[in-house]
Curated annotation (Swiss-Prot):
HAMAP family: IlvD. It comes from the Bacteria. Homodimer. The gene is ilvD. [2Fe-2S] cluster binds at C119, C193. Belongs to the IlvD/Edd family. The active site is at S467. This is Dihydroxy-acid dehydratase. Signal peptide: none annotated. Its cofactor is [2Fe-2S] cluster; Mg(2+).
């Protein structure tokens, strides 16, 4: 075992002495050393419940014959970080988490890892570390929050009843009292936000790829099932160490394709494009951006999930969960291995009944194409991403007049002051991985568009990204970004922009000669942040079309 490096032989007397100083008895020195990477924090609801799950994981590890060691990782909530300087740090924490897991596992020669995670960037960061290390690992996602409940059976959700409600209040659609009712009921307890936002989408894809146990991706944070999954995961990691089953044997090209298909079938978060590209990069799997669009054209959307639809994670769980989605997808799902022994098709076959009011059959889809589309054009030569499951039929094709803003704050101010009108295309730039830095989520302006009733008359494009809670005609991940001299930085107020999602095109209707003249006079703006971690990050992060990963160069 890897841990023999620090536990065996007289040369390791100092190492054993330190371990004994931590309370490890001699009898445990020949047991598998299992690291439990926990992102517990009492700052955010998605991670508050992890102390309980830690206990059950530890019990499982010891029952399985291993010895558990806890170490901590940061957990950032995109909702709390939204709309201010804090959002610059969200995506970069994905890289920090991957590096921290790698550092602890290698420094202390851990034999295997249980990765306890939940919210947006923590899960992909841990999966990146698992693929990079390629030692036995299992993921436990802490589970989604229940929907909020109100009178007359009303269900509340975080994005619809906070960010969008804020704009409805500003527009005079709801009263201050109604806004407070939303605030009090939107988040009723622990767990990741209730809809198919980034955290829950990543939990589902982790299960789809076979890196977590069945139903881990959908079991509610408050459920006893989640505790049992935590215990079983602790037991399982010891078995994985004994059999040397490692992530790269699970994270194959076919497993990534299955994850993309499930993502498309559910209409998941556009952030998953960034994260799957980054995880595949660590796993040594070639996964071009175009793969998402190729699969989208042949994978129907089978569920209508919040925020764009009516169903919540609690509905998906009882309807059949991830295995139920794979069952409905049939032969579109490839038969891949999971870390718990069963193949994906065996899991799908194990589901006896699927609630087809939630997860529809292929013969009766919500939409003929999957939830994510990749666009190209002279604004996005290397690609852009749209969550087409959240776009109304009316806005699938649109032409409008550009209103340009060099930051999210400037765009948000214009929206709240009523300066954006029907027929506009809001352009938010210098918010990419380098230019932001950190590729901030534009949830506040996109939610404002919907709350102000502009979702069917105004489009938004950006080199930043969007929350999993975003809906509406919002195109992000535009590559190359403005800070790298991308064409989005050449757009001027009054230019006409054409959006054609069915044709996968995003075009600036300006003569090429005019664009070349603008490019000749373009000057890169100074960095927005010139010191600290983000300044270093901006120098080494790649473009969105490659997953916004950091490089050694």
């Amino acid at each position: 075992m890897r841990s023999d490096t620090i536990t065996q032989g007289f040369e390791r007397t100092p190492h054993r002495a330190l371990l004994k100083g931590s309370g490890v008895p001699q009898s445990q020195m020949d047991k598998p050393f299992i690291g439990v990477a926990t992102s517990f924090t009492d700052l955010i609801p998605g991670h508050v419940g992890m102390r309980d799950l830690e206990r059950f994981i530890e019990k499982g590890v010891h029952t399985g014959g291993g010895h558990a060691f806890f170490f901590g990782l940061p957990g950032v909530c995109d909702g709390i970080a939204m709309g201010h300087k804090g959002m610059h740090y969200s995506l970069p924490t994905r890289e920090l988490i991957a590096d921290m897991v790698e550092s602890v596992a290698e420094a202390h020669r851990l034999d295997g890892l249980v990765l306890l995670t939940n919210c947006d960037k923590i899960t992909p960061g841990m999966l990146m570390a698992a693929a990079r290390l390629d030692i036995p690992c299992i993921v436990v996602t802490a589970g989604p929050m229940m929907s909020g409940r109100g009178q007359e059976g009303r269900k509340f959700s975080f994005v619809t009843d906070t960010f969008e409600a804020m704009a409805r209040y500003k527009a005079g659609v709801i009263s201050e009292r109604e806004l407070m009712v939303c605030e009090e009921n939107a988040c009723p307890g622990i767990g990741s936000c209730q809809g198919l936002f980034t955290a829950n989408t990543m939990a589902i894809l982790t299960e789809t790829m076979g890196m977590s146990l069945p139903r881990c991706g959908t079991a509610l944070a408050v459920s006893a099932l989640k505790r049992r999954i935590a215990f079983a995961s602790g037991e399982k990691i010891v078995e994985l160490v004994q059999n040397n089953i490692t992530p790269r044997s699970i994270l194959t090209r076919e497993a990534f394709e299955n994850a993309i298909r499930v993502d498309l079938a559910l209409g998941g978060s556009s952030n998953t494009v960034l994260h799957l590209l980054a995880i595949a990069n660590e796993a040594g799997v070639e996964l071009p951006l175009e793969t998402f669009d190729i699969l989208a054209k042949e994978t129907p959307q089978l569920a209508s999930m919040n925020p764009a639809g009516e169903h919540f994670m609690e509905d998906l769980d009882v309807a059949g969960g991830v295995s139920g989605v794979m069952k409905q997808l049939g032969d579109k799902i490839k038969d891949t291995q999971t870390l718990f022994g069963l193949t994906t098709r065996q899991l799908a076959a194990s589901v006896e009944n699927v609630d087809e009011t939630v997860i529809r059959p292929l013969t009766n889809p919500v939409k003929k194409e999957g939830g994510i589309a990749v666009l190209f054009g002279n604004i996005a030569p290397k690609g852009a991403v749209v969550k087409q499951s959240g776009v109304s039929d009316k806005m699938m094709k649109f032409e409008g007049t550009a209103r340009c803003f060099d930051s999210e704050e400037l765009a948000m101010a214009a929206l709240m002051e009523g300066e954006i009108v029907a027929g506009n295309v809001v352009v938010i730039r210098y918010e990419g991985p380098k230019g932001g830095p950190g590729m901030r989520e534009m949830l506040a302006p996109t939610a404002a568009l919907m709350g102000l009733g502009l979702g069917d008359s105004v489009a938004l494009i950006t080199d930043g990204r969007f929350s999993g809670g975003t809906r509406g005609p919002c195109i992000g991940h535009i590559s190359p970004e403005a800070a790298q001299g991308g064409p989005i930085g050449l757009i001027q107020d009054g230019d006409r922009i054409s959006l054609d999602i069915p044709a996968r095109r995003l075009e600036l209707l300006v003569d090429e000669a005019v664009l070349q003249a603008r490019a000749a006079t373009w000057v890169a703006p100074p960095p927005k942040i010139a010191k600290g971690w983000l300044a270093r990050y901006a120098k080494v992060v790649t473009s969105a079309h490659t997953g916004a990963v950091t490089t050694a160069e």
